[in-house]
Amino acid sequence: RTYLMGWGSILEMSSSVTQLTASGDVKDTWNRPLRDLRISVIDRCNYRCPYCMPDEVYGDGYEFLPRRHWLTPGEIKRVAGLFMQLGVTKLRVTGGEPLLRKDIVEIVSGLNELPGLDLALTTNGALLAGLAGELKAAGLKRITISLDSLDDAVFKQMSGEKGNIANVLEGVEAARIVGLSPIKLNVVVQKSKNDHTVLDLVDHFRGSGVIVRFIEYMDVGTLNGWRLDEVVTSKVLMEQIDERWSLKPVEPNYRGEVAQRYVFEDGQGEIGFISSVSEPFCGDCHRARLSADGTIYTCLFAKQGICVREQLRAGASDADLIGLLQNLWRHRTDRYSEQRGKETTKKVSKSRIEMYRMGG
């Protein structure tokens, strides 16, 4: 028997779980289906962004996961395939910084062999220029690149003095040349840190085909010193941008899309706003997360997860693993962003998992 600890109970599950069919959906306690999977392939990063991996915590002596604990490309592919049997159709490879894995092209190639999968990757772009062609050839369709400012001093501060804007822009151009599409740019906005550079960034990418998306600064993990008064809401940003370039809202591409989409009325492209703090979207969250060491989380703000690495390496059957995943999702109750600020949430906040471990 396998025992799942957490979520207020012990879920006892027999090893004789019946395997679901490829079309078998599973829903959580709030009737939310499982559609998206984020796979963090590495817990390391070449940046030290203060809102994710502050350098004073993750310095030179910090002990990350032993490499032997990382899931192999074959294990990653297997788990992704099992998730697809429960309804997953969209998969995003993340980190840490995923391009730091020497076998990242092999990982992408293996995932691309899974039929009917919408495959994307999120990166800080620092290493993308040299890998874009190989990733595209391996089957990568879409890419999202993090870039918090085009002001060199601001960018250096927000990357922990590790980033180089020129490298990121070279990565964006390389992605465009090889045909990765769409290319999205994620911008985390903090008050008095980079909010004054937002309009310049929009101006730079308007008309380029790159979709810029602004993300409200979130209280992911416990080490980034998050404060509500440092959040710049999507409403404020949208009004600032709309004052300079008229915007028009457009329908989401699919139910559960996290970004609110707008297009420029003059036809110069699209931007988006991700409002996890001011307008939580828990009710339509269909996403699970798999960490580099094989731990599965059901929320970005999770306090705990279930590790399947040992089961994978001990010869567990697909039926056993699917039953485990099914039970995990069926008992999912997460609605943290909607509960943010309540006393019960504040009491447990210090145990949340850090973002670099489960993928942003």
Predicted regions located by residue number:
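Radical SAM/AdoMet-radical enzyme domain recognition
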Residues: 70-93, 97-215
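Glycine-centered loop/turn positions within well-structured domains
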Residues: 47, 152-153, 280, 306
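Radical SAM enzyme core and accessory elements
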Residues: 3-27, 279-360
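Residues that scaffold the ATP/ADP-binding catalytic core of kinase and kinase-like folds
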Residues: 48, 52, 153, 158, ...
